[in-house]
Each structure stands twice: as C-alpha cells, then as structure tokens.
Design a protein with these regions (language model features):
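N-terminal pre-Walker A segment at the start of P-loop NTPase domains
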Residues: 1-27, 166-210
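An accessory alpha-helical subdomain
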Residues: 126-179, 308, 312-351
Length: 358
C-alpha cells in the first residue's frame, strides 16, 4: 500500500505577542470524529506516542498532518488524520487544551497515570525551580522578539512610504480576477483554518512550506516589508470566503496576525510570500515582485536607517533564538526528572490500544 501524503506545520509560535496559539484550528470540532487530548508532564512520552501512531497509520496509506512544536521542531504538538477526522493533540502548557465536546468528540488520555508519584515528588523543589527558570527564559525571548519586531516595523513604514500603492492596486485586482474567474458569490461563507507554516525555534527560523505549497497553481509574492504583499493575500482570502470556498491561512512567525501564505484547496491554488526569512522551494506559475513599485530615490534617502534597522533586527532575533535554545535546555533538564519515573511499557500498551481503535 502506498504511503499517505504528509504535511507539516506549526499550531503555535514564539512571536512578538508571546506564545501565540492557533490550536483551535488543528482539527475544528465540526470536522472532527475523535480528538484525543494527551495530558501528562514533560518527558512522559507524548511526542513519541504520537510518532508511533503516525508511523502505523501513515504506513497504511493514511494522509497525515504533523503539528510541530515551535520550542522543539523535532517534537510534535499534534497529529491529524484528515480523512478519518481524527487528531491527537498535546493538551499541556503552554497550550492547555480541554475537551469541548467530552465523550462525543473529545477524549483525555492521561499518560501521567503511568508515572511513579514518589519519584517525582522527591524532585519537587528541583522541578519547581527548573519550571521557573524555563518560564523566565521564554519571557525574555519574547521581549527580544518584540524589540526586534519594533525595529522591523520601522522598515515597514519606510518601504510603505516609498511604495506606489496605485500600481500595486492594479496588480492586486488583476490577480484576484485571475484566481476567481467565472466563480460567483455564494450565499454561504467559506470556512477558514488558521495555522503557522514557519516558526522561531531553538534551531533558528524553520518553515515547512515545501510540504504545503503543492497545488497546481502557485502564486509567489516577493517584496520588502511594507510593500503590501499581505494586502493581496487578504484580498484573495476575502474573495474566497465570499464565494463559499474553504481556505487555509498561514501567518507570520514574527507577527502572528499578519497573513503570509494562503491555500485554496478547491481551486488547487496557493499564494505564498517569499523573502529572506522563508522561501517555498517551488516553481511559480505566477511571480509578482512588489519591490518593482518602490521609489528608489526615496529609499536612497533612508538607506542608512534601513541598513541599521536590518542589522539590529538580526541581532535581536538571534539573541531571542539563543534564549529559546537556553529554555529548551532547561526543558530537557525538566524532562530528566520524569523520564526515570515513567512506566513506558504501560505507555506503549496504551499507544497500541489507541492504534487499534483508530
């Protein structure tokens, strides 16, 4: 049997607004038949639990979506089997998830039942201290990211000022007409899904665009911050919703409310932003460079400012990444208090039982 299709993304991210969650869109309740919520402390085997179930079902030909952890991309915060309407999600901090439709859709799997309470209690003070240190490191990282974004925004203002928005509006209108040619307005609004394709992680900037931008039509947008690439994507999304089409929106790792990539599965169309921070390694069917509409004379007046901003942004972002690395090291230390006190043979039995049910 052929292996199922794999897609990779992030349900949450380390952003200028702190940890930002789109976990409600991992598998919306209206599409779900069963959502298993894993509970338990660090090191109890939640990610390994999901990996083994994913390997079992993917080998049987099931399509799968891997929801990576922005604080450790090698780990999973969730897996989704779209055709089955099934998801398994890590429901512990910082993305605490509780059942919304208990029994009918949602079910809690508590891996904490398989640990040795006495062994963990013995390390109580160390666990509390390490938890506190991890939290402090993440908060510091978020302050660095917020500072980096403030500088990034200054460049946005400069490029926006130099932009010929009239010419950009013409291109935006022409592209919307191209995507929706012959498709009328619907009486029913299209459904939406919101996630991240990229994240600021201990490994640096990581993106999974190559697993997502696989449609027949691939519109690639280029342009400096402030040139208006997001305006085009937002216009296309709005038009898709008006026509009753389902959309998948993927947001900026730095600013989690800024739209950067859009997929319209029913039209087999993707619109993706390509820049120095993330690039989809795909051959575009249409490429639009918004930098062509910039007033170069005006940019030359602010050359020193934009150069300074870019350098300081990179310095602060790299500092944030280093701090997230330190937080991961502390989290790994936290796991070391739980791993020796886990009965992993019982966890494996639980995993095998879940796999049979699915």
């Amino acid at each position: 049997m052929a292996k199922g299709k794999e897609r990779h993304m992030f349900p949450g991210g380390n952003t200028s607004k702190g940890f930002f969650s789109y976990y409600d869109f991992v598998l919306p309740q209206e599409k779900a038949k069963r959502i298993l919520i894993l509970k338990g402390g660090p090191g109890v085997g939640k990610s390994s639990f999901m990996k083994k179930i994913a390997a079992g079902l993917c080998g049987e030909g099931c399509d799968i979506e891997y929801m990576h952890c922005s604080s450790d991309p090698a780990s999973f915060d969730g897996i989704v089997f779209p055709d089955k309407g099934v998801a398994i999600i890590d429901g512990t901090a910082p993305h605490i998830i509780d059942p919304k439709t208990p029994g009918a859709i949602d079910e809690i799997i508590n891996l904490g039942q398989f640990w040795n309470d006495e062994g963990i209690i013995e390390n109580r003070d160390k666990i509390l201290a390490t938890n506190q240190q991890t939290s402090e490191l993440f908060q510091r990282a978020y302050r660095y990211i917020q500072a980096a974004y403030s500088i990034y925004k200054d460049n946005e203002v400069i490029y926006n000022k130099a932009m010929n928005h009239g010419k950009a509006n013409v291109i935006i209108s022409e592209t919307v007409d191209r995507v929706f040619e012959g498709i009328g307005i619907s009486e029913i609004e299209g459904k939406q899904r919101h996630l991240f394709a990229s994240a600021i992680t201990p490994e640096g900037l990581v993106n999974y665009l190559s697993s997502l931008i696989t449609t027949q039509e691939r519109i690639v947008l280029k342009g400096n911050p402030g040139t208006g690439t997001e305006r085009l994507i937002e216009r296309i999304r709005s038009a898709a919703i008006e026509r009753g089409l389902y959309t998948e929106s993927f947001y900026c790792a730095l600013n989690p409310i800024r739209l950067e990539h859009l997929i319209i599965p029913e039209l087999d169309v993707s619109i993706t932003t390509s820049n120095e921070f993330h690039n989809a390694d795909v051959k575009p069917t249409l490429e639009i460079d918004f930098n062509e509409f910039l007033d170069q004379d005006m940019l030359n007046k602010y050359k020193e400012e934009t150069k300074f901003n870019r350098k300081e942004f990179e310095t602060l972002l790299n500092r944030a990444i280093k701090t997230i690395q330190q937080a991961k090291e502390k989290h790994d230390e936290l796991e070391s208090f739980y791993v020796p006190n886990m009965n992993f043979s019982e966890v494996q039995k639980c995993q095998e039982e879940i796999l049979k049910r699915l």
